[in-house]
From Swiss-Prot:
Organism of provenance: Xanthomonas oryzae pv. oryzae (strain KACC10331 / KXO85)
EC numbers, comma separated: 5.3.1.24
Alphabetical UniProt keywords: Amino-acid biosynthesis, Aromatic amino acid biosynthesis, Isomerase, Tryptophan biosynthesis
NCBIfam families, sorted: PRK01222.1-2, PRK01222.1-4
Name of this chain's protein: N-(5'-phosphoribosyl)anthranilate isomerase
GO terms of biological process kind: L-tryptophan biosynthetic process
Gene from which this protein is expressed: trpF
Enzyme category, top tier: isomerase
Length: 222
């Protein structure tokens, strides 16, 4: 990949405040995420997300995150929030994920038990999710939620993927430079790494995170 023509995309997830969304836009973040997964401390109601969506800057994607939600719940979010991208963290199959007529990302759990007890395999992932827009590799274990603040062994990322991938799990301003240099992801997804508390973002951490991503991009161009 020619890194001179490339920049790492940035997604801030777990948004719960309009002010944080506005700052994300000012910082040039590519996407903001709302969480609708049951049990998440960052979960918001569709009506809340719809109101906060008004703070989104032009050309910033709005991502809706689910984990084993019902089809009716996903449809309500699609209708109410009008996201541009869906993200699934549960046991959802490809047919379910693509049934909402929106592009989607499939999260792959890379916690201590890996994917069904084994490391992720590019061929298996792509055969299982042929219609995904990309994969997101996170540090949580299968069946668990993200936002743990823990990293995973980046050397376990599968090789040979023909889809873009995002790196998540324990990323913050202190390690995102090394993460990008080591894995060359299409994008990085951060939640707890730019927070004061679950769902409450910190402006200084947000700004520093973006600066470190851009520093990594410049490093790869040199």
């Amino acid at each position: 990949m020619n890194r001179s023509l490339y920049r790492t995309r940035i997604k801030f997830c777990g948004m719960t405040r309009a002010g944080d969304i506005r700052l994300a836009g000012e910082l040039g973040v590519d996407a903001v995420g709302f969480i609708f997964a049951h049990g998440s401390p960052r979960r918001v109601a569709p009506a809340e997300a719809r109101a906060m969506r008004q703070a989104t800057a032009p050309m910033v994607d709005v991502v809706a995150l689910f984990r084993n939600n019902s089809k009716e719940e996903v449809r309500e979010v699609v209708r109410t929030v009008r996201p541009t991208l869906l993200q699934f963290h549960g046991e959802e199959e490809d047919a379910f994920c693509r049934s909402f007529n929106l592009p989607y990302l499939k999260a792959v759990p890379m916690g201590s038990t890996g994917v069904n007890g084994e490391d992720a395999n590019a061929r298996t992932l792509q055969l299982s999710y042929p219609n995904t827009a990309g994969f997101l590799f996170d540090s949580h274990a299968p069946g668990a939620g993200g936002g743990t603040g823990k990293t995973f062994d980046w050397s376990r990322l599968p090789t040979g993927l023909h889809r873009p991938f995002l790196l998540a799990g324990g990323i913050n301003a202190g390690n995102v430079f090394d993460a990008i240099v080591a894995t060359l992801p299409w994008g990085v997804d951060v939640s707890s790494g730019v927070e004061l508390a679950p769902g409450i973002k910190d402006g200084h951490k947000m700004r520093k995170f973006v600066e470190e991503v851009r520093r990594a991009d410049c490093h790869e161009m040199s």
